[in-house]
Amino acid sequence: MQETGVHNGAHGADKFGLKNLKGIYWNFGAPQLYEHALRNGEAVLSADGALVADTGVFTGRSPKDKFTVRDATTETTMWWGGNQSITAEQFETLYQDFIKHAEGMTLFAQDLYGGADPSFQIKTRVFTELAWHSLFIRTLLRRPDRADLAAFVPELTLIDLPSFRADPKRHGCRSENVVAIDFARKIVLIGGTQYAGEMKKSVFTTLNYYLPERGVLPMHCSANVGPAGDTAIFFGLSGTGKTTLSADPNRTLIGDDEHGWGKDGVFNFEGGCYAKCIKLSPEAEPEIFAASSRFGAVLENVVLDEITRKPDFDNGSKTENTRSAYPLESIPNASPTGRAGQPKNVVMLAADAFGVMPPIAKLTPAQAMYHFLSGYTAKVAGTERGVTEPTPEFSTCFGSPFLPRDPSVYGNMLRDLIHNHNVDCWLVNTGWTGGKYGTGHRMPIKVTRALLTAALDGSLRNAEFRTDPYFGFAVPTALPGVPSDILEPAKTWADKAEFDKTARALVGMFQKNFAKFEAQVDADVRAAAPDVKIAAE
């Protein structure tokens, strides 16, 4: 077997059972991986120097094809209400079949860190069949110094083989596509899909399992910090604006998707960003556009002009879930450390497809826990397979597919952190105004940015607030530069009776969804629920 590149020879591929390989390329950088991806026909070049790849049938995550080994430990530590299980024996069969399938292949290996805080990071080794997948995960996780690679000993191992086809009867899975995690052995197997996001979310899921035991809250969020050292966290599902809103030229970016919050503050899990880029423009999102238009960026399912090879970011013919992966250092004001102090503000983003939520609301600590456990948003087109238009969704902790443990574990940790550090909490609707999806329109990003700026710089604290009659939270009545009507959703609807009917319906959905958490939360959190009786007055 031919091996090229720097790595720890005492902890090579053979330690994981990989054998009879044609070769391994260890820890290659972007130029080398570009060469291999282009030579192998995996990807093409854009006119701006980005590597552009198609992911085939799978243009989003497949949460129904994700499985975790159920053993004596995970029997009691896993949240089986939200996760699917396979037996240790089924995983071992799958693992051996992966090893057999890899024989004769040339693989790409990356040694990386999951987590910017050395006290809590997990050393991760990723074997990939495709060169562009190797570049993707090298971009998304954190890269060790070259001098540290020779002594790198992995704790978590991912094997990513898109050409592998699982057998549901043999492997205990659902289809030919599979993501399987064994927390005891710290091994992740990904087969049958070229969608690169499965790799990063598998590392995220692993950190979500281990970090609560060590007093760190893992979060599906973005984070940035202001000139005064004021850290802000933005919770939200894919497509709600985490990446866009955290890329603020007046604030330092910590990260766009995954973070931990512990006794020393906030730290990024990653070293790159993974931005939705449908309708990406230099006017609306200049920093993300620039980062996606240069050497080192990886574009997924983005259509190129046949002649100019310029990306057509407005073209969603392959999927609405077009993506751009780029290193954090491509953002001019990104933090080199990926770490920041204790948050001053927590923002919960919701793409309200009903168009009845205000653009911003201030939450009490009890309301914050209620809305964190509810995780209301809309499934935005293309983020998961089979979703072609936004539909209402409650995803607990704003990341249900990535939660190995019971949601109450994360909710209680958030409650304590908010209380201990006197954090201000906000709910922001980045979804629809002037009507529900189909009749209204998306909330203008300029409005959202103006409201967020006022919240984060403290000026919104001094505003006059009204109590929303449906949801009970505090909504500002006026803010310079923001149309007053947009702050009161009912005024943006032509049909006020239809607004009332729609708002009441959403209140009922919140109550129905939260019923499963009522026995696990304190009375003040139950009292923070939207109230149909209020809405009916």
From Swiss-Prot:
Q: Where is the composition biased (Basic and acidic residues)?
A: 311-321
Q: Which Pfam families does the record match to this protein?
A: PEPCK_ATP
Disordered: annotated segments:
311-342
For this protein, what does the record note about how its cofactor is bound?
Binds 1 Mn(2+) ion per subunit.
Q: In which pathway does it act?
A: Carbohydrate biosynthesis; gluconeogenesis
Q: For ATP, which residues are the binding ones? A: 201, 220, 236-244, 285, 323, 448
Q: Which molecular function terms from Gene Ontology are attached?
A: ATP binding; metal ion binding; phosphoenolpyruvate carboxykinase (ATP) activity
Any one GO CC term of this protein is: cytosol
Major localisation = cytoplasm
Q: What is its EC number?
A: 4.1.1.49
A single Gene Ontology biological process assigned to it is:
gluconeogenesis
- Which annotated residues bind substrate? 61, 195, 201, 323
Q: Per UniProt, where does Mn(2+) bind?
A: 201, 220, 257
| Reactions accelerated catalytically | oxaloacetate + ATP = phosphoenolpyruvate + ADP + CO2
Entries under CDD domains matching the protein: PEPCK_ATP
Name the keywords, alphabetized: ATP-binding, Cytoplasm, Decarboxylase, Gluconeogenesis, Lyase, Manganese, Metal-binding, Nucleotide-binding
Its biological function? Answer: Involved in the gluconeogenesis. Catalyzes the conversion of oxaloacetate (OAA) to phosphoenolpyruvate (PEP) through direct phosphoryl transfer between the nucleoside triphosphate and OAA.
Q: Which family does it belong to?
A: Belongs to the phosphoenolpyruvate carboxykinase (ATP) family.
For this protein, the record's PANTHER family field holds: PHOSPHOENOLPYRUVATE CARBOXYKINASE (ATP), PHOSPHOENOLPYRUVATE CARBOXYKINASE ATP
The molecule here is called Phosphoenolpyruvate carboxykinase (ATP)
Q: What is the primary gene name for this protein?
A: pckA
